[in-house]
Amino acid sequence: MRKNRAPKREVLADPMYNSIVVTRLINRVMLDGKRGVAAQIVYGAFKQIEEATGNNPLEVFETAMENIMPVLEVRARRVGGSNYQVPVEVRPERRTTLGLRWLVTIARNRGEHTMQDRLAKEILDAANNTGAAVKKREDTHKMAEANRAFAHFRW
C-alpha cells in the first residue's frame, strides 16, 4: 500500500475553448502520446458539431456530458462471506472521468469512417439524450436502483 495519496496533477485549460474538460477529452482521445493528433480529432469533431447544429460546440459538449455523467454507481462490498453490489454516489471528479471514458470508448467502437466523425456523432447523440453513452449511464443507474436494498452497507 502506498504511504500517502498521490497529488492531483494540474491540467491546463485548452487554448481554443479555454476549458479543462476539453483538455481532459483530448488527453483521453490521445494514443501513444500524440497530443497533436488527438487535438486535431477533438477540434475537428467540434467543428462538425458547430456545422451540424449552428450552436456553440462547447455548449453542446457540456450538455452531452451532463447526459452521460452518472450520479450513482455500484461498488462491490464483501460482507460475511458474500459480495454485495452496494449503490454509492459518484464524486464530481469521478463523474467527469467516467463520462469522458465512456464517451471516447463508445465513440471508438462506432461504425463511422474517422474518429473525428465518430466522436462528433456520439457527442451529438449524447446531447440529444440518445446513443450508447447515455444508455451506459442508464444501465449504471438501473444497477444502482436494483441493488438499493444493500444501500445500508455503504461505508
From Swiss-Prot:
UniProt cross-references to CDD domains, sorted A to Z: uS7_Bacteria
InterPro entries, per database record: Ribosomal_uS7 (IPR000235), Ribosomal_uS7_bac/org-type (IPR005717), Ribosomal_uS7_CS (IPR020606), Ribosomal_uS7_dom (IPR023798), Ribosomal_uS7_dom_sf (IPR036823)
PROSITE patterns, A to Z: RIBOSOMAL_S7 (PS00052)
One cellular component term from this protein's GO annotations in UniProt: small ribosomal subunit
Assembly: Part of the 30S ribosomal subunit. Contacts proteins S9 and S11.
Task of the protein: One of the primary rRNA binding proteins, it binds directly to 16S rRNA where it nucleates assembly of the head domain of the 30S subunit. Is located at the subunit interface close to the decoding center, probably blocks exit of the E-site tRNA.
Name of the protein in its database record: Small ribosomal subunit protein uS7
Protein species of origin: Lactococcus lactis subsp. cremoris (strain MG1363)
UniProt gene name: rpsG
